[in-house]
Every structure is written in C-alpha cells, then in structure tokens.
C-alpha cells in the first residue's frame, strides 16, 4: 500500500499490483495454481490478472516450470465465458418473481457454474432453485 502511495503509478497498474498482492496474500498451496482455481480468478478478475499472477510466479520461482508457461499461454487465447442461465429464463421457466430471491438464486447458480469449470446441468439448476 505504501509503495503505491509513495510512487506515482497509474491507476491501471495500481489495480494490477493490488490483484497480484491479494492473490498471494492467501496461503499458496499446490491447488493454488490448479486450472479450476485460475478459472475462478479468470472469471471474477479477468484475463490480465491471471496472466499477471502466473508471470509473477514464473519470475519468482528459481527453476523453470513448463506447466506454468503452458497455463499462461492457454489464458492468452481464452475469452471470459457468459453464464448460460439468465434471469429471464428463471422467471419464465420456474415462475420466480423479480427481487432478492431471484438474485440469490442466480448468485448460487453462478457460483456452482464457476466451481464446475463453467459447466452446469439442468438438474443442478433445478436443485438450486428448489432449495
């Protein structure tokens, strides 16, 4: 934080540095750089953040990890997926009224969708709606 305050850095680069900081703030485990975890970061924070985090890990490590390089290359070509379930669909198909309940259901569906690497079945959607 003080570094960002002390030196004149653009807001865009400040955001990039903060994203890297928050990613590494949590304890790093073997699952931290799994594709499913990086997909979660990719969806919520964007392509640039994932690439920055992977590149920082490559620069920080003492030996070359080809898996990280391949992950980095794979994220250069990816686009952020759109969630297949929309509010209109839930309102028409399941007769859910607009409001907090609809928002909560959409949020739970989105979390499940991201957790399953951007895949969700109709059965999973129905289970979430009925709970």
Please name every model-derived segment.
Residues 1-131:
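C-terminal subdomains that position terminal phosphate/3'-OH groups for nucleotidyl transfer/ligation
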């Amino acid at each position: 934080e003080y570094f960002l305050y002390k030196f004149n850095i653009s807001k865009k680069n400040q955001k990039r540095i903060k994203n890297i900081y928050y990613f590494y703030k949590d304890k790093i485990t073997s699952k931290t750089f799994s594709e499913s975890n990086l997909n979660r970061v990719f969806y919520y924070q964007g392509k640039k953040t994932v690439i920055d985090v992977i590149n920082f890990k490559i620069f920080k490590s003492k030996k070359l990890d080809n898996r990280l390089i391949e992950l980095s290359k794979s994220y250069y070509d990816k686009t952020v997926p759109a969630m297949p379930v929309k509010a209109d669909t839930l309102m028409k198909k399941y007769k859910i009224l607009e409001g907090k309940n609809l928002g909560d259901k959409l949020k739970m569906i989105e979390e499940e969708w991201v957790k399953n690497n951007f895949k969700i079945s109709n059965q999973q959607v129905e289970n979430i709606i009925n709970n």
